[in-house]
């Protein structure tokens, strides 16, 4: 299996994003653009500035309650996620809970043909294997691209997360 790298970009200025992204893509195959670090009103400008490079980008608009920096309302975030999908990035990272609770968003993104990276984070612990397997099973229903991030406090925690790769033969897993 060939591994690919993805560098994360947290540029706050939409006019500087293109040059930062260009540099990042000389060092890595892909780049994650953390659009949640920008003001909501500047995200459309940022997307226009990097439109030609989005085929190599994972776009993320993470809300504060999921560890992100997005400063707008959830309604505004959903609207911006739809806009991002229209630009057809390589992947659009959307949280499991957001997708599970918003069928209209799922349908909209599906129509745009932008692949979804369904993500889930636990910033306090690594759940037990039964719960991790259940989470993976439920996430796989929403996308072939799944990202699970937890806090590992022991080698056992790390082993549980890494063992998910054995259960992910038909999906692309990031853990």
What residue ranges belong to the model's regions?
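Catalytic beta/alpha-barrel core
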Residues: 8-10, 30-39, 60, 87-101, ...
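Acidic (Asp/Glu)-rich catalytic clusters
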Residues: 21-26, 42-57, 82-87, 103-113, ...
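Active-site mouth loops of central-metabolism enzymes
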Residues: 2-17, 63-75, 119-130
């Amino acid at each position: 299996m060939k591994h690919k790298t993805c560098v994360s970009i947290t540029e706050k200025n939409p006019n500087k994003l293109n040059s930062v992204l260009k540099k990042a893509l000389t060092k890595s195959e892909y780049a994650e653009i953390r659009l949640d670090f920008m003001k909501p009103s500047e995200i459309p400008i940022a997307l226009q500035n990097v439109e030609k490079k989005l085929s190599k980008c994972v776009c993320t608009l993470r809300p504060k309650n999921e560890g992100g920096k997005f400063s707008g309302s959830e309604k505004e975030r959903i609207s911006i996620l739809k806009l991002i999908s229209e630009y057809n990035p390589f992947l659009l990272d959307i949280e499991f809970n957001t997708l599970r609770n918003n069928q209209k968003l799922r349908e909209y993104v599906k129509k745009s043909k932008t692949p979804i990276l369904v993500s889930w984070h636990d910033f306090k612990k690594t759940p037990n294997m039964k719960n991790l397997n259940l989470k993976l099973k439920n996430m796989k229903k929403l996308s072939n691209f799944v990202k699970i991030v937890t806090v590992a406090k022991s080698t056992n925690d790390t082993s549980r997360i890494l063992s998910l790769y054995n259960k992910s033969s038909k999906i692309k897993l990031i853990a």
